């Protein structure tokens, strides 16, 4: 699933081609993804794209006729091409075409993403309930420690909760907990202030490095230029079950936590008794 670094990579990849452009047409080939595609999208001819931004895993196109919320879902990706350059494929569900012939193409084999229109993205219900951005100054050790009090949930599930902090998906939660030396099943309420300080620090580091590497490509995700994300080459625990830990040589284990596969080193990430 594309996570925060993949969406940020997509944003940085498409922004130079779309900022300031006028929408000529939005071609919708599939009426329903995760939700029905907003009818308003097909009536945005003449709208100017005045800005592009990201909030959590949502890419937002801000236009003179409202905002477009895009979520990549489980398998979505965005590409830039020229009009009539390449016929749409089976999984190419939406094309946003600008007046100069630039095409933003949305590909999504599993159709779990979304394209929604809203008057103001900041006031949309999908956005207003979100927690702080992990790379922002508001995501601090003091904040995380305060939110973790009386939370019996596993720390991995805790940091993946978008109400707590956005964008820390399964891959980056596993990697961050390894870097912090924390077992994924540790109860959030048992985190110390020092552990929260370390965890916040490594979450920021892991996500920043992943963005530099263009995200992580495991199966479907590609960058807008067609290249894969290269962070997969430096994963320490995720997807490495039965392989040796790079730090201590102990065999990496996997366990389902919160309905997701979780990877950890039982030596570097001991669970306190």
Swiss-Prot record:
Recorded hits in PROSITE patterns, A to Z, give: FPG_CAT (PS51068), ZF_FPG_1 (PS01242), ZF_FPG_2 (PS51066)
User: What are the EC numbers?
Assistant: 3.2.2.23, 4.2.99.18
Zn-finger region bounds: FPG-type = 236-270
Task: Check the record and name the InterPro entries matching this protein.
Answer: DNA_glyclase/AP_lyase_DNA-bd, DNA_glyclase_Znf_dom_DNA_BS, Formamido-pyr_DNA_Glyclase, FPG_cat, MutM-like_N-ter, Ribosomal_uS13-like_H2TH, Znf_DNA_glyclase/AP_lyase, Znf_FPG/IleRS
User: Transmembrane residues, as ranges?
Assistant: none
Residues at the active site: 2 (schiff-base intermediate with dna), 3 (proton donor), 57 (proton donor), 260 (proton donor)
SUPFAM superfamilies xref list = Glucocorticoid receptor-like (DNA-binding domain), N-terminal domain of MutM-like DNA repair proteins, S13-like H2TH domain
Against Pfam families, the record matches this protein to: Fapy_DNA_glyco, H2TH, zf-FPG_IleRS
Co-factor binding details? Binds 1 zinc ion per subunit.
Swiss-Prot/TrEMBL catalytic activity: Hydrolysis of DNA containing ring-opened 7-methylguanine residues, releasing 2,6-diamino-4-hydroxy-5-(N-methyl)formamidopyrimidine; 2'-deoxyribonucleotide-(2'-deoxyribose 5'-phosphate)-2'-deoxyribonucleotide-DNA = a 3'-end 2'-deoxyribonucleotide-(2,3-dehydro-2,3-deoxyribose 5'-phosphate)-DNA + a 5'-end 5'-phospho-2'-deoxyribonucleoside-DNA + H(+)
What is the required cofactor set for this protein?
A: Zn(2+)
A GO biological process held by the record: base-excision repair
UniProt keywords, alphabetically: DNA damage, DNA repair, DNA-binding, Glycosidase, Hydrolase, Lyase, Metal-binding, Multifunctional enzyme, Zinc, Zinc-finger
Which Gene Ontology molecular function entries are recorded, alphabetically?
Answer: 8-oxo-7,8-dihydroguanine DNA N-glycosylase activity; class I DNA-(apurinic or apyrimidinic site) endonuclease activity; damaged DNA binding; zinc ion binding
Q: Which domain of life is it from?
A: Bacteria
Q: Where does DNA bind?
A: 91, 110, 151
Q: Tell me the HAMAP family matching this sequence.
A: Fapy_DNA_glycosyl (MF_00103)
Q: What does this protein do?
A: Involved in base excision repair of DNA damaged by oxidation or by mutagenic agents. Acts as a DNA glycosylase that recognizes and removes damaged bases. Has a preference for oxidized purines, such as 7,8-dihydro-8-oxoguanine (8-oxoG). Has AP (apurinic/apyrimidinic) lyase activity and introduces nicks in the DNA strand. Cleaves the DNA backbone by beta-delta elimination to generate a single-strand break at the site of the removed base with both 3'- and 5'-phosphates.
Q: What is its quaternary makeup?
A: Monomer.
What family is this?
A: Belongs to the FPG family.
Q: What is this protein called?
A: Formamidopyrimidine-DNA glycosylase
Taxonomy-wise, where does this protein's organism fall, top ranks first? Bacteria, Pseudomonadati, Pseudomonadota, Gammaproteobacteria, Pasteurellales
């Amino acid at each position: 699933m594309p996570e925060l670094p993949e969406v940020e990579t997509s944003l940085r990849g498409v922004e130079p081609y779309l900022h300031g452009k006028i929408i000529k047409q939005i071609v919708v080939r599939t009426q329903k993804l995760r939700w029905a595609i907003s009818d308003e999208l097909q009536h945005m001819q003449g709208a100017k794209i005045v800005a592009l931004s990201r909030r959590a895993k949502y890419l937002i196109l801000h236009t003179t006729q409202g905002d477009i919320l895009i979520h990549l879902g489980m398998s979505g990706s965005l590409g830039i091409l020229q009009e009539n350059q390449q016929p749409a494929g089976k999984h190419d569900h939406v094309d946003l075409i600008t007046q100069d012939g630039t095409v933003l193409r949305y590909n999504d084999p599993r159709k779990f993403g979304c394209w929604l229109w809203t008057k103001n993205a900041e006031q949309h219900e999908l956005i207003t309930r979100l927690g702080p951005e992990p790379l922002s100054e508001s995501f601090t050790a003091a904040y995380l420690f305060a939110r973790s009090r009386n939370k019996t949930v596993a720390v991995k599930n805790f940091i993946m909760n978008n109400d707590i902090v956005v964008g820390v998906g399964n891959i980056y939660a596993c990697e961050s907990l390894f870097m912090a030396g924390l077992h994924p099943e540790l109860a959030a309420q048992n985190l110390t202030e020092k552990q929260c300080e370390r965890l916040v620090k490594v979450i920021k580091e892991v996500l920043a490095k992943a963005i530099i590497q263009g995200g992580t490509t495991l199966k479907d995700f590609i960058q807008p230029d067609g290249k894969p994300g290269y962070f997969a080459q430096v994963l320490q625990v995720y997807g490495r079950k039965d392989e040796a830990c790079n730090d201590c040589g102990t065999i990496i284990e996997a366990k389902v936590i919160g309905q997701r596969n979780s990877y950890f080193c039982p030596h570097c990430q001991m669970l306190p008794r």
